[in-house]
Amino acid sequence: MHWITRFSAFFSAALAMILLSPSLQSFSPAAAIRSSHPYADEFKPQQNSDYSSFRESPMFRNAEQCRSSGEDSGVCNPNLVHVAITLDIDYLRGSIAAVNSILQHSMCPQSVFFHFLVSSESQNLESLIRSTFPKLTNLKIYYFAPETVQSLISSSVRQALEQPLNYARNYLADLLEPCVKRVIYLDSDLVVVDDIVKLWKTGLGQRTIGAPEYCHANFTKYFTGGFWSDKRFNGTFKGRNPCYFNTGVMVIDLKKWRQFRFTKRIEKWMEIQKIERIYELGSLPPFLLVFAGHVAPISHRWNQHGLGGDNVRGSCRDLHSGPVSLLHWSGSGKPWLRLDSKLPCPLDTLWAPYDLYKHSH
């Protein structure tokens, strides 16, 4: 359990920095998505960065008490924990750090199967992943064709929210093998600081997805005035208790998803959006329209979200109260960009130990 001591040290250091900084402030979930800043160019991803320069990850082995995979070491092995993450050249450093964090904190790392979603076949990301994690055998690359969803995407408040790969999670039930009945979907801008199997074992009851919910958020802000004033739409949530949830951390029952054809339901709302303009925030609102009020609640410890803040100089996010199992830099600010720019937020120091980029910090 050496990682507990290591994490505690980083955690304590970050908290001390938070207490000493008068400029830290909190943002609502909506603000974390919408925020922008006058220094944006300083934090833009560098398209020509040498993303092949990653250190090789050490080998992570299962503890003795882990269930044996037996002869079946393929994706259909019932003892596997399935995790889906996108691979994009601009966020690749974040994705690799996320994988590294999961392996470091898992008691049974060899029982975790990673499903990587890519939207380009020309960047050879599979070779990069395999060279960075040479001992990781439980992985597969899935090509998500941008044209699958391109015609359904509407303009958003941030161009980054319009990228087709943001919508790949809508198609996990189609992309992954039919034998995969459940999957954890994770964004690329987070690290896991607890055993992922605890999240995997979350009970969903009769629900199709599970996620931490935030019922204090002003739910009406996620849709336009036209949506709420139109009789065709304003009854959508009737009989439901809709709450905001962040789609960057979800446990998904793929069997139910396939059974009830939720991909088609999401696509229907995206088609309406193209004509009616009922929301502004990219891939999140269609999920809210379909699932809000029908989500199995998961402990907030599994999504300490909004840590990206808005990159305004001297303005950073604090942690929510309570225990922490997952740190999520949602919002426009990413820890690797701030660290490289020598303008980090205190909590970015908790991301840095999982960074495998050779020439960082």
Swiss-Prot record:
<feature type="transmembrane region" description="Helical; Signal-anchor for type II membrane protein">
    <location>
        <begin position="7"/>
        <end position="27"/>
    </location>
</feature>
<keyword id="KW-0961">Cell wall biogenesis/degradation</keyword>
<keyword id="KW-0333">Golgi apparatus</keyword>
<dbReference type="GO" id="GO:0071668">
    <property type="term" value="P:plant-type cell wall assembly"/>
</dbReference>
<dbReference type="GO" id="GO:0005794">
    <property type="term" value="C:Golgi apparatus"/>
</dbReference>
<feature type="topological domain" description="Cytoplasmic">
    <location>
        <begin position="1"/>
        <end position="6"/>
    </location>
</feature>
<keyword id="KW-0812">Transmembrane</keyword>
<dbReference type="GO" id="GO:0000139">
    <property type="term" value="C:Golgi membrane"/>
</dbReference>
<comment type="pathway">
    <text>Glycan metabolism; pectin biosynthesis.</text>
</comment>
<dbReference type="InterPro" id="IPR002495">
    <property type="entry name" value="Glyco_trans_8"/>
</dbReference>
<dbReference type="Pfam" id="PF01501">
    <property type="entry name" value="Glyco_transf_8"/>
</dbReference>
<keyword id="KW-0808">Transferase</keyword>
<protein>
    <recommendedName>
        <fullName>Probable galacturonosyltransferase-like 5</fullName>
        <ecNumber>2.4.1.-</ecNumber>
    </recommendedName>
</protein>
<dbReference type="GO" id="GO:0045489">
    <property type="term" value="P:pectin biosynthetic process"/>
</dbReference>
<comment type="similarity">
    <text>Belongs to the glycosyltransferase 8 family.</text>
</comment>
<keyword id="KW-0328">Glycosyltransferase</keyword>
<dbReference type="GO" id="GO:0048354">
    <property type="term" value="P:mucilage biosynthetic process involved in seed coat development"/>
</dbReference>
<feature type="topological domain" description="Lumenal">
    <location>
        <begin position="28"/>
        <end position="361"/>
    </location>
</feature>
<keyword id="KW-0735">Signal-anchor</keyword>
<feature type="glycosylation site" description="N-linked (GlcNAc...) asparagine">
    <location>
        <position position="234"/>
    </location>
</feature>
<keyword id="KW-0325">Glycoprotein</keyword>
<dbReference type="GO" id="GO:0048363">
    <property type="term" value="P:mucilage pectin metabolic process"/>
</dbReference>
<feature type="glycosylation site" description="N-linked (GlcNAc...) asparagine">
    <location>
        <position position="218"/>
    </location>
</feature>
<dbReference type="GO" id="GO:0047262">
    <property type="term" value="F:polygalacturonate 4-alpha-galacturonosyltransferase activity"/>
</dbReference>
<dbReference type="GO" id="GO:0005783">
    <property type="term" value="C:endoplasmic reticulum"/>
</dbReference>
<dbReference type="InterPro" id="IPR029044">
    <property type="entry name" value="Nucleotide-diphossugar_trans"/>
</dbReference>
<comment type="function">
    <text>May be involved in pectin and/or xylans biosynthesis in cell walls.</text>
</comment>
<keyword id="KW-0472">Membrane</keyword>
<keyword id="KW-1133">Transmembrane helix</keyword>
<dbReference type="InterPro" id="IPR050748">
    <property type="entry name" value="Glycosyltrans_8_dom-fam"/>
</dbReference>
